[in-house]
A protein has these predicted regions:
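Conserved SAM/SAH cofactor-binding pocket of Class I
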Residues: 4-84
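Short alpha-helix immediately C-terminal to the canonical SAM-binding loop
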Residues: 59-60, 100, 127
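Hydrophobic beta-strand segment of the Class I
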Residues: 90-93
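A short glycine-rich, Lys/Arg-flanked "PGG" loop and its adjoining helix->strand segment in the class I
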Residues: 101-116
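ADP-ribose/adenylate-binding Rossmann-like module
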Residues: 114-127
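Conserved class I S-adenosyl-L-methionine
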Residues: 124-137
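Core SAM-dependent methyltransferase catalytic element
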Residues: 140-158
Length: 158
């Protein structure tokens, strides 16, 4: 499962997460992979973090990593729209531009107004496409990081 913490997109998500007040908040790690981002959110003080991935191996990896860290959380395996019924204050989505664009309508549905979307896995060549799709249409850009050809964004749901 993706998420060792060594990739630029993961590192930038962690930086944006560290700049976000997670204390007492509900977090959702979408496309959780190894669970590194959600585990970091819990370590930073999130009240609750749910994890979801369409890959059963990733969901199992996230469960194993939660266990290794002495944490418990709900881990869902399936499509976001069909599987998840919660509402998060913060969504972590380190995916790809194509997957983010596919989830554009689903992410706001599982997010509280004023919530923060942290998304990465976006190559520079696709940044404008992501910005056009998300910002001004339900989200306001709050922060952006760029590193070695990759982008990460923090956005607030309007």
């Amino acid at each position: 499962a993706f998420g060792t913490g060594l990739h630029e997109s993961t590192g930038m998500c962690l930086k944006l997460l560290s700049r976000t007040d997670v204390n007492g908040r509900t977090v959702l790690d979408v496309g959780c992979g190894s669970g590194i981002l959600g585990i970091a959110a819990l370590r930073l003080g999130a009240e609750k973090c749910d994890f979801i991935d369409i890959d059963p191996l990733a969901a199992e990896a996230a469960k194993a990593n939660l266990d290794c860290n002495g944490m418990t959380a709900e881990v869902f395996c399936g499509d976001l729209a069909e599987t998840y019924r919660g509402h998060a204050d913060i969504i972590l989505a380190n995916l790809t531009a194509d997957i983010l664009l596919r989830l554009k309508d689903d992410l706001p549905r599982v997010m509280k107004r004023g919530g923060v979307l942290i998304m990465s896995g976006i190559i520079d060549a696709r940044a404008r496409e992501i910005e056009d799709a998300f910002f001004g249409d339900g989200f306001a850009k709050a922060d952006m990081l760029a590193e070695n050809g990759w982008r990460a964004y923090a956005a607030v749901k309007q």
